[in-house]
A protein has these predicted regions:
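Conserved C-terminal "switch" segment of AAA+ ATPases
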Residues: 1-51, 71-77, 117
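Residue-identity detector for glycine
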Residues: 44, 54-56, 105-107
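Short, structured motif recognition centered on aromatic/hydrophobic residues
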Residues: 5-8, 59-67
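C-terminal engagement/docking regions of AAA+ P-loop ATPases
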Residues: 60, 69-118
């Protein structure tokens, strides 16, 4: 899980984005949950949910969808101007809002809400 957070952080940085600390902590809990849980694959074989999700592909999609959530959040805020930091920062809320649809799309169960508690 720690390595996947590092990969997500590097991917985001290459895209001129950054995760706030709470977002990184939530991702670490999410990846740990997926690594510890199992799900049957297309052949009915039990595999780690993280492997079913596709590790690197899942991380890339999480970064991209979290950026989309950030853009939506900023577009729908009452603020007229944003700092560069605000434009670059992906919050825990952005990450959390991107997770459930992504997991459902992969046929995986959404983890219990305690993974996103701070």
């Amino acid at each position: 899980p720690k390595e996947l957070v590092e990969i997500a952080t590097r991917m985001a940085e290459k895209r001129d984005s950054r995760f706030e600390e709470a977002a990184r902590a939530d991702m670490k809990r999410l990846f740990a949950h997926l690594a510890e849980s199992s799900t049957p694959d297309a052949n009915g074989v039990q595999r780690r949910s993280l492997d079913v999700a596709g590790n690197g592909r899942f991380v890339r999609n999480l970064v991209e969808r979290s950026e989309e959530e950030r853009e939506y959040r900023l577009d729908h805020s009452d603020a007229e101007d944003f700092t560069d930091d605000e434009l670059m920062t992906i919050t825990a809320t952005d990450v959390n809002n991107s997770v459930a649809p992504q997991l459902r799309g992969l046929g995986l169960s959404v983890p219990p809400s305690q993974w996103e508690q701070r």
